[in-house]
Each structure stands twice: as C-alpha cells, then as structure tokens.
C-alpha cells in the first residue's frame, strides 16, 4: 500500500469534484453532484458499513445509516475510493471491521482520511489548536469537529502521522460525546441518522424519476411507486402540498 499515492489520489478526487486541496468538505453534497451516482442510506446491520456497485449501466453507493454521522462521512469517502480507483471489482460490500488481508479495503480505508483531512490542512489545524504542545483529548475533538470525522478515525489518523501513540486509545476514547458538548460542539457527529430518516435515496435515481414525470411517460401512480421504492414517501406524498403555499424558502 503506497500512502503517498493514496494521498495524491485523494487530492486529485477533491479537485475533480470541485473542491480545493485543504478545506473541510461536505462529502454528501459532493456525492450528489457526481454524474450518474445514486446514493442510498439504509440500516445495513451491525457488520456492514457500506457498499459500492459500479458497471457500465449504474453507479450506486449505500451507507449504513445506523452508524454515527462521522462514521457515515468516513464510509462515503471509503466508497468513493472503490468508485473511482478500485479496478479489482465492480461490487464491494465493506465490513465495519477492516480485514488487513484485503488490499483494496486497506487502500480505501487509508484513502478516506486523506480525502476528509488532507495532510497539509491537518498539519495546519493541529498547529492552530495545539501549537507545539502535546495533543490532548480536547484537541482531538476540535480536529474531528473541524474535519467532520469520527473520533476513532481522527485518533488513528493522528497515530499514523506520529502525533499520538496507539497505546493511548483507551485514554482518548472515554466520554467523547459529553466532552464535545462541554466544549460547545454539536453532538451530531457522534449520533446515527434519526430513525425516521434512516431509509433514503438521493441522486441519479430520483433525477430519472423526475424525468419520467416531466415527460409524462408513466402514470402518477407509477411515479409514486418508484419514489416509495426509493424510500421517498416524503416526495410521493408531500411534494404537491409543499409547493402549493408558494412560500420562498430561505
């Protein structure tokens, strides 16, 4: 596994998707802009973090919506590696526990933190929050909040860069959410998607359904059926009501 090559790939993909080399990214918005990509959020169970399916006819990424928001962001970055750089398979089901024997999974797991927190940006952020001193638990939380990464992902990233020791994992893993709140941060990063929103589809599939609707190629009942298949009852049953008021949304 070539870490420099993976870091370079992460930078290249950020640029391809219209992001600069250093800023924190709204990775879900970026994914929604990828031509032909359907993004599905679904409770995938205790063992699966996500999956990527790609061939000449479709591109699909699924994310386990019962994981924390920070872990979902990491998993999406992981799946983007499979989508753009993994030539071994067109179908990847990714376990929450990394199998070190599977090279493309190791590469995807290394790619993800490089995409979310590029090296130069991470180094600058560390300098800002910790100066030249040791990195404390509070500093780790500040960094993960800035880059939108799960606590463990940020901890291991700092270990890989030599800022922390893996022996400190237990000391840095207790009371994370309560400390984040105490420090004034939103705790969204550490929580799963609310139960009522854990089944959702975005991206290309919905654009295709809308194209069918605009061209009047299928019945309104069929449109509703397609939307319900994508867990978008909010659109199937709420779109007309939302539009009738004519109120501008700020």
List each language-model region with its residue ranges:
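Active-site hotspot residues in diverse enzymes, especially metal/ion-binding acidic/histidine motifs
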Residues: 1-250
């Amino acid at each position: 596994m070539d870490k420099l090559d993976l870091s370079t790939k992460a930078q290249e993909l950020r640029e391809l998707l219209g992001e600069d080399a250093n800023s924190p990214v709204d990775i879900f918005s970026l994914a929604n802009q990828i031509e032909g990509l359907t993004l599905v959020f679904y409770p995938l169970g205790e063992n699966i973090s996500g999956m990527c399916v790609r061939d000449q006819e479709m591109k699909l990424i699924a994310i386990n919506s019962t994981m924390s928001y920070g872990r979902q962001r990491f998993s999406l970055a992981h799946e983007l590696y499979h989508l753009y750089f993994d030539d071994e398979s067109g179908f990847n089901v990714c376990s929450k526990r990394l199998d070190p024997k599977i090279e493309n999974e190791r590469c995807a797991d290394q790619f993800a933190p490089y995409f979310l927190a590029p090296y130069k940006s991470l180094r600058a952020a560390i300098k800002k929050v910790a100066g030249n001193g040791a990195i404390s638990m509070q500093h780790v939380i500040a960094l993960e909040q800035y880059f939108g990464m799960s606590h463990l992902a940020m901890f291991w990233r700092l270990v890989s860069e030599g800022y922390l020791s893996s022996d400190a994992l237990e000391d840095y893993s207790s009371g994370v959410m309560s400390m984040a709140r105490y420090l004034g941060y939103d705790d969204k990063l550490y929580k799963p998607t609310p139960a009522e929103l854990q089944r959702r589809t975005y991206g290309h599939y919905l654009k295709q359904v809308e194209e069918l609707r605009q061209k009047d190629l299928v019945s309104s009942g069929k449109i509703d059926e397609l939307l319900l298949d994508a867990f978008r009852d909010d659109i199937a049953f709420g779109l007309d009501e939302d539009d009738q008021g004519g109120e501008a949304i700020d």
